[in-house]
Every structure is written in C-alpha cells, then in structure tokens.
Curated annotation (Swiss-Prot):
Reaction(s) catalysed (UniProt annotation): N(6)-acetyl-L-lysyl-[protein] + NAD(+) + H2O = 2''-O-acetyl-ADP-D-ribose + nicotinamide + L-lysyl-[protein]; N(6)-succinyl-L-lysyl-[protein] + NAD(+) + H2O = 2''-O-succinyl-ADP-D-ribose + nicotinamide + L-lysyl-[protein]; N(6)-(2-hydroxyisobutanoyl)-L-lysyl-[protein] + NAD(+) + H2O = 2''-O-(2-hydroxyisobutanoyl)-ADP-D-ribose + nicotinamide + L-lysyl-[protein]
Domain of life: Bacteria
Free-text comment on this protein's domains from its UniProt entry: 2 residues (Tyr-92 and Arg-95) present in a large hydrophobic pocket are probably involved in substrate specificity. They are important for desuccinylation activity, but dispensable for deacetylation activity.
UniProt cofactor note: Binds 1 zinc ion per subunit.
Origin species: Escherichia coli O6:H1 (strain CFT073 / ATCC 700928 / UPEC)
Assigned GO CC terms: cytoplasm
InterPro entries: DHS-like_NAD/FAD-binding_dom, NAD-dep_sirtuin_deacylases, Sirtuin, Sirtuin_cat_small_dom_sf, Sirtuin_class_III, Ssirtuin_cat_dom
Name of the protein described by the UniProt record: NAD-dependent protein deacylase
Family of this protein: Belongs to the sirtuin family. Class III subfamily.
Length: 273
C-alpha cells in the first residue's frame, strides 16, 4: 500500500506527464502536423533588445539606454511602483507612446522570423525578452513575451490582463475585483518571475535548433537557455551585433546588424528544409 507521500509523488508524476503532453501539443502540434512535416526541425528562437534597436526602440543596456534617465530601482521594481506609482506610470506611458509612433516599424530581422514561422508552422516558437509588439506586427503569431507586453496592463490585485494603448494614470482602476484596484504595467520587473517558463523549458527540451538574436547574455534565466538547449541535443546559433556574455556556448555564430545577419541565416536555413 502506498503511503500518503507515495500517493502525492505518484500524482505529481502523472500530472507532470500530462503537462508535458499538453505543452508539446500546444507548442509544436497544434494542428496535427501531417507526416511529411515531421521532417522539418523544431526551431526555438529567443530575441532580445538588439533585434528592435534598428527599429528605433532604445535598448536597456546600451550606453544611451533607458536607465540613464531613471534608476532601475525606481521604475522597474515592485518596490519602486509601491513608492511612486505615478513616476512608474509616466515612464511606461512614454515608452508606450514611442512604440506607437509611425516611424517605429518591424525591420528586416522581424520580417525574416515571420517568414521562418510561415515555413515551419507550429514547429516554430518565438520567445522574446522584448515588451514591444514588433514581432506580431511583422506577422509572428506563436510568441511568448517572457517579460510582458507594453501595450497591456494588469490588475495589481487579481493579475487580470487588459489591452491598453493609451496613458495610464493613478486614477485608472481595474474593476474585476470586489474593490477597484490600481492598474500596473504588464511588465516583468526585477525580482519577479518571467512569464511562460514552463512552456519555454518544455520547448527547449524538444527543440532541434535554438537561435538567440540580439541578446546580451547578462539576464537570467534567458542567458541559460543555450545551455539548456544543448543539454537536450539542440544545434545552437547566435546572431548578434557582437558576441554575448554566453557566446562561447553556441555552436554557430554570426555577428553584425540584426537586419543583415538574421535574414541571411533564415534564407540559409530555409534552403536546407
């Protein structure tokens, strides 16, 4: 007879197997892929700020990055929001307005990844650290925003997420709860858990090819994805302006502007399919 602990362990293992199967189907087999499509590789792409820099989105870690104007602790932590929500909302309102300027458009790198998804279908997954919507505007649909999305807000009490394109003020409240609660940016701040991690790690365990684009290799857990992918046998590729902090982990590397190296690599990959 199983002990209570044994029952819990058995139930945990069954639930884990079920989760793995659900995620596997969600990521790569949503439309019951036909047999000939099975020959196509499962490709997992990670993008960082470098892919959007050429579209005019300022990066966080560059010399002229956003943190020049504000301390990280003031605008990108839960504690900063608690201290001065108006400052935090003003900061993200400016970023939101910038993103919606007509000159901010997907560049050739974004468009190349949309083309890659078109070729691979549900055997393609894009994970981005960026909070802009340039991947979606380029045509990508299978996207996980692990650090949140700038054009969304969420209830600070229930966590309910809402689409939001305008400014947010301290007077704006979410009415999904019994008592109206303040809205906060739908952005993962320092000290908070990134979004979609179960799905991401499942995809890493199944990927045939892992490609990192425009990432610094400074921020974990994303900086550790290449190691995780290698453990499961994936071929790893870095496409970056310069070698990242984890550049030596990659089997294949190409350096230059994202708008140049990403389309070139995608064309090379598509020719091999």
């Amino acid at each position: 007879m199983l002990s209570r602990r044994g029952h819990r362990l058995s139930r945990f293992r069954k639930n884990k197997r079920r989760l793995r199967e659900r995620l596997r189907q969600r990521i790569f087999f949503r439309d019951k892929v036909v047999p000939e499509a099975m020959e196509k590789p499962r490709v997992l792409v990670l993008t960082g700020a470098g892919i959007s820099a050429e579209s005019g989105i300022r990066t966080f870690r560059a010399a002229d990055g956003l943190w020049e104007e504000h301390r990280v602790e003031d605008v990108a932590t839960p504690e900063g929001f608690d201290r001065d929500p108006e400052l935090v909302q003003t900061f993200y309102n400016a970023r939101r307005r910038q993103l919606q300027q007509p000159e901010i458009q997907p560049n050739a790198a974004h468009l190349a990844l949309a083309k890659l998804q078109d070729a691979l279908g549900d055997r393609f997954l894009l994970v981005t650290q960026n909070i802009d919507n340039l991947h979606e505007r380029a045509g990508n649909t299978n996207v996980i925003h692990m650090h949140g999305e700038l054009l969304k807000v969420r209830c600070s009490q229930s966590g309910q997420v809402l689409d939001w394109t305008g400014d947010v003020t301290p007077e704006d409240k979410c009415h999904c709860c019994q008592f109206p609660a303040p809205l906060r940016p739908h952005v993962v701040w320092f000290g908070e858990m990134p979004l979609g991690m179960d799905e991401i790690y499942m995809a890493l365990s199944m990927a045939d090819i892992f490609i990192a684009i425009g990432t610094s290799g400074h921020v974990y857990p994303a900086a550790g994805f290449v190691h995780e992918a290698k453990l499961h046998g994936a071929h790893t590729v870095e496409l970056n302006l310069e070698p990242s902090q984890v550049g030596n982990e990659f089997a294949e590397k190409y350096y230059g502007p994202a708008s140049q190296v990403v389309p070139e690599f995608v064309e090379k990959l598509l020719k091999g399919l």
